[in-house]
Amino acid sequence: MDYSVKGRVPNYVTALATFPDVAQAIAGLAHAVVHEGPLAPEIKLAAALRVAQINNSAYTAAHVQRMLRTSERGRSLLRNLESGDLSSLREADRVALTYADALTNDTQAGSDAEFRAVQQNYGDDEIVDLTAAVGFFNYLTRFVEALALPVESWVLDPAETPSGGEGQSDAGRVALLSDEEIAVMGSAARTVTERPGATSGLALPNSQRAMLRVPAISLAWTTLNTALKGINKLDPETALQVSFAVSMENGCRYCTMHQVVGLRRLGVSPAKLLAMKKDDASLTARERVAVDFARKLTSSPSELTNADYESLRGEFGDDGALEVLLEACRFAFMNRFTDGLRLPSEDGTVQAYRDVYGTDKL
C-alpha cells in the first residue's frame, strides 16, 4: 500500500512490471486514497481492513494491519476490529465501518434511510473520500487474490513496521460540483477536465463531478485510467463487455448505462444489446471467457481459483488476461463509487439507454 520501508516494493506493484505506467498509477492511487482527502488515514484503513476481511484477502489485510500499527489511533482501531467489539468506538467510526461493510456487500450500500447515519456524521467531501477508499480496496482485494499474490515477508515482520504519528431518490447522496465550482478549484480539477479526450462543462460525467470533491483522488483515478489505455491488448468491445457484465452483476444502473453508450458508439447493434441482458448467447466464445471470469471475480472473489485465471490466460495470453482482470477490478471500484453515492445518470446517457431498451430501468 505504501513505501514506508525503504527499498521495499509490494508484490501488487511488481505483478505489473510489464506495464510500469499502470504499476505507478495504481501505487499513486493507493497513496491518494489513504493519505489524501479530508478523512484521517486510520479510519480509511480500518474500512479497508473490513473490505479485506469480507473478501477474504489475507494479502490486503496484512498490509492494512501493518499500516494501522503505525499510530496510536490506528492501533486502537485495530484492537477493536480484531476483537469484533465496536461498541467502544465513537459513533462516526462505527458508522464508517458499517458503511464499508454495506458497500462491499452491495454496491447500493443500503437504503437512503440507513445512509442518513453517514450523512449525519460526515460532510459530502468526507463521504466521497470514504466511498473512494472502500471502492479502491474492493478493487485491490480482487486484483491480488486473482493473482494469488503472497504476502511479503517484510510486511509480516514487526521489526519492519515504520513509526508514525496519528430506496433510491432521484438526487445523489452527495451534491455534485457545478461548472462554476470546478472552474475555481485549481490545477487538479483542470488536469482532470482538460486532459486529451476528456469531456468538460455540462458533458462532464457526474462521477467526476462527485470525485472532484477530493481532487487528489480524482487526479490519481484519471491517471490510472489513462495508463490502462496503454495496455491495449483487448479489443474495445471485449473490454466493454467485461465492464457491462460486472456492472450488471452488481446491479449498478449508472455504470451499466455508460457501458451501453460505449458499446453503441462502437457499433454494437441494438439486437445484440437486447440479447446481452437476457443471456450470453450473443457473445463470442472469447467474450464469454472474459465475462465468465469477470462475473466470478465480482460475485465471489475468494472462490476464484488458479484454474480460473489459467483459463483466462489460455484465451488472452499473459498481458490480455491482466487487462481483463484490471478492467473487472476497475468497475469493482466504480460501481461502488457511483451506486453507493446514488449518482444520477446524465440525461443524454439515460436517453441513449432508453433508445435501446425502451426503459430507464435495469
What is each PLM-predicted segment?
Residues 20-26, 56-60, 95, 104-112, ...:
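Short acidic alpha-helix initiation/capping motifs at coil-to-helix transition points
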Residues 1-45, 69, 79, 151-238, ...:
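Secretory/endomembrane lumenal or extracellular ectodomains immediately following the signal peptide
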Residues 45-78, 246-271:
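Conserved alpha-helical segments that form or flank metal/cofactor-binding pockets of metalloenzymes
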Residues 83, 88-133, 286-327:
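Acidic/histidine-rich alpha-helical segments that form the ligand environment
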Residues 16, 30, 46-51, 81, ...:
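Short alpha-helical scaffolding segments that buttress acidic/His motifs in well-ordered protein cores
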Residues 114, 124-164, 318-359:
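Preference for long, well-ordered alpha-helical segments
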Residues 8-14, 41-55, 121, 126-131, ...:
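Alpha-helical scaffold segments that form or flank carboxylate-/histidine-based iron centers
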Residues 84, 262-271, 276-284:
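Histidine/lysine/aspartate-rich catalytic loop segments that bind and position anionic ligands
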